[in-house]
C-alpha cells in the first residue's frame, strides 16, 4: 500500500516511502482524476465501512526495498505521473546528493551495489551513520539470530528495528492509516524481527494507538515454522 520501488515489485513489499500511499492508487480518469493515492484510499475505506466491510492492511516493519527510503536514505524520488514501474529506470529519479554521479552509466549489478552500499555500508564507507539498516549479509539461518539481521532477499533490505528512530518512524507512518480508519494490520515477516524488539517496541505502541483512536485493532503476524 505504501510507495514502493522495485523492478520486480508486484506485491507491494518494497517500500521506498512508508509515509504515503503508492502513486499507482491515484485517480486517473473522470471525477477521480488528480486525486492522490492517499485520497483514493480514504474513499475506499469510507465506502467499505458504509457497507460494513473491514479494511485489514498488510504492513511491513522488517525491511524496505533496495532503492532507499524517502526519510531514512532518499536515494531516489518517484515520478508520480508514471503509474507503471516495470521500467524502473524510467520512473525512478536518482538523488545525486547521495548516489554516485555516474550511477546511470553503470550496469544493473553495479547500480544495485551502489544502492545497497548507502544502506548497508557494503563498500566499507559509513553511509548509514544512524544505523537505520542492519549491516550484515544476505544469508541467514532460520534457527539462528541471523534471521533477525540478515537480508531475506536481494530486494528486501533489513531495517535495524533495534534503532529507536526506525521504530518511531514506522509507528508514526502506520498511525496515519489507523487515523484514516484501517481496522487492522497483518504484519509481514514478523518472524524476522527479534522477539524482544517486536514485543517491546511495536506491540505496545500499536495497542496504545488502538486505545487512542477508540477502536480495537487486530494485530496478526506472519511466521514460518522451521525448517524454512
Protein language model annotation of sequence segments:
Residues 1-180, 197-213:
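Substrate-binding/active-site clefts of carbohydrate-active enzymes
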Residues 55-57, 185, 214-215, 220, ...:
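Hydrophobic faces of well-ordered beta-strands that scaffold small-molecule active sites
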Residues 63, 185, 193:
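Glycine-rich nucleotide phosphate-binding loop and flanking beta-alpha elements
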Residues 180-186:
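Short, surface-exposed connector motifs at secondary-structure boundaries
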Residues 191-197:
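Acidic-and-aromatic substrate-binding clefts and catalytic sites of carbohydrate-active enzymes
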Residues 223:
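Noncatalytic carbohydrate-binding groove/subsite architecture in carbohydrate-active enzymes
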Amino acid at each position: 500500500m505504501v510507495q514502493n520501488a522495485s523492478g520486480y515489485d508486484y506485491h507491494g513489499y518494497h517500500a521506498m516511502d512508508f509515509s504515503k500511499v503508492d502513486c499507482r492508487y491515484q485517480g486517473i480518469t473522470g471525477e477521480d482524476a488528480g486525486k492522490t493515492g492517499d485520497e483514493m484510499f480514504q474513499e475506499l475505506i469510507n465506502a467499505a465501512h458504509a457497507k460494513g466491510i473491514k479494511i485489514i492492511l498488510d504492513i511491513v516493519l522488517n525491511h524496505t526495498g533496495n532503492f532507499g527510503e524517502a526519510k531514512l536514505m532518499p536515494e531516489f524520488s518517484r515520478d508520480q505521473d508514471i503509474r507503471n514501474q516495470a521500467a524502473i529506470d524510467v520512473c525512478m529519479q536518482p538523488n545525486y546528493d547521495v548516489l554516485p554521479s555516474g550511477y546511470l552509466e553503470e550496469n544493473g549489478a553495479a547500480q544495485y551495489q551502489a544502492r545497497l552500499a548507502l544502506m548497508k555500508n557494503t563498500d566499507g564507507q559509513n553511509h548509514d551513520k544512524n544505523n537505520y539498516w542492519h549491516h550484515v549479509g544476505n544469508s541467514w539461518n532460520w534457527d539462528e539470530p541471523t534471521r533477525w539481521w540478515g537480508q531475506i532477499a536481494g530486494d528486501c533490505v533489513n531495517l535495524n528495528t533495534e534503532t529507536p528512530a526506525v521504530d518511531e518512524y514506522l509507528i508514526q507512518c502506520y498511525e496515519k492509516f489507523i487515523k484514516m480508519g484501517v481496522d487492522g494490520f497483518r504484519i509481514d515477516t514478523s518472524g524476522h524481527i527479534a522477539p524482544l524488539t517486536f514485543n517491546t517496541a511495536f506491540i505496545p505502541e500499536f495497542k496504545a494507538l488502538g486505545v487512542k483512536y477508540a477502536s480495537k485493532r487486530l494485530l496478526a503476524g506472519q511466521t514460518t515454522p522451521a525448517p524454512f
